[in-house]
């Protein structure tokens, strides 16, 4: 019983964490404000180096 429960929790975490990450990434991309802020910080870091 414990092994089955552990397997269920492990699979739930294994599937759930990437799903939550992808949903958060999708929301931040859709938001626009966060996406542009992320792009600005990336350009700011890459710009001065090159």
UniProtKB/Swiss-Prot annotation:
Record-linked Pfam families: PsbM
Function: One of the components of the core complex of photosystem II (PSII). PSII is a light-driven water:plastoquinone oxidoreductase that uses light energy to abstract electrons from H(2)O, generating O(2) and a proton gradient subsequently used for ATP formation. It consists of a core antenna complex that captures photons, and an electron transfer chain that converts photonic excitation into a charge separation. This subunit is found at the monomer-monomer interface.
Lineage, opening ranks: Bacteria, Bacillati, Cyanobacteriota, Cyanophyceae, Synechococcales
SUPFAM superfamilies named among the record's database cross-references: Photosystem II reaction center protein M, PsbM
HAMAP family, per the entry: PSII_PsbM
Cysteines engaged in disulfide bonds, as pairs: none
InterPro entries for this protein: PSII_PsbM (IPR007826), PSII_PsbM_sf (IPR037269)
Record-level GO BP terms: photosynthesis, light reaction
Membrane-crossing segments per the record: 7-27
Topology of the protein relative to the lipid bilayer: Single-pass membrane protein
Protein name according to UniProt: Photosystem II reaction center protein M
Gene that produces this protein: psbM
Entry's family note: Belongs to the PsbM family.
């Amino acid at each position: 019983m414990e092994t089955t429960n552990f397997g269920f929790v492990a699979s739930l975490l294994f599937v759930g964490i990437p799903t939550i990450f992808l949903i958060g990434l999708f929301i931040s991309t859709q938001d626009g404000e966060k996406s542009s802020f992320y792009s600005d910080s990336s350009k700011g870091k890459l710009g001065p180096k090159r």
